[in-house]
Amino acid sequence: MKVFIAVFALIAVAAAEFTVSTTEDLQRYRTECVSSLNIPADYVEKFKKWEFPEDDTTMCYIKCVFNKMQLFDDTEGPLVDNLVHQLAHGRDAEEVRTEVLKCVDKNTDNNACHWAFRGFKCFQKNNLSLIKASIKKD
């Protein structure tokens, strides 16, 4: 019984650590990733217009932002519970989870940048408005 309580407490603490990112958080993460990855200015302009070329620069930028938002882990892949919390915003969480799970796959080419980008592009294809609306304006 003590083990069960300890495991439950650990899960509760881990779940409590995730905080939905705000617009300000996203801007900070974008700036940090542009700087740390030396993203060229022409790419930054594309990203601002929600244009994401399918190349390593873009893919690693998406992974960097998702890592900072705690939506993706380089080993575990998409963090489904965190994605649901980030994207739900008053919507039915199970419906959001279903949409997220459609885009979760394995790291087939052993490249975390490609893995994060595949999930992003898959979800973006049918849910761009949900992604844009998910960033809290606090």
UniProtKB/Swiss-Prot annotation:
| GO MF | lipid binding; odorant binding
Where is this protein localized, as stated in its record? Answer: Secreted
Which positions make up the signal peptide?
Answer: 1-16
The UniProt record gives the binding positions of (9Z,12Z)-octadecadienoate as 30, 61
InterPro entries reported in the protein's UniProt record: PBP/GOBP, PBP_GOBP_sf
Q: Which body tissues produce this protein?
A: High-level expression in female mouth parts, particularly in the proboscis (at protein level). Moderate-level expression in female antenna (at protein level). Expressed in testis but not in the accessory gland or ejaculatory duct (at protein level). Expressed in spermathecae (at protein level). Female salivary gland. Female chemosensory organs: antenna, palp and proboscis. Not detected in midgut.
Gene Ontology CC annotation, any one: extracellular space
Would the keyword Ion transport be found if you checked this record's keyword annotation? no
| GO annotation terms (biological process) | sensory perception of smell
The source's domain of life comes to Eukaryota
Q: Explain the induction of this protein.
A: (Microbial infection) Up-regulated in salivary glands following dengue virus type 2 infection.
Which residues pair up as cystines? 33-64, 60-113, 103-122
Write out the entry's keywords from A to Z.
Answer: Behavior, Disulfide bond, Glycoprotein, Secreted, Signal
UniProt similarity note: Belongs to the PBP/GOBP family.
> How would you summarize the oligomeric state and partners of this protein?
Monomer in solution.
Name-wise, this protein is Odorant-binding protein 22
**Top-level taxonomy:** Eukaryota, Metazoa, Ecdysozoa, Arthropoda, Hexapoda
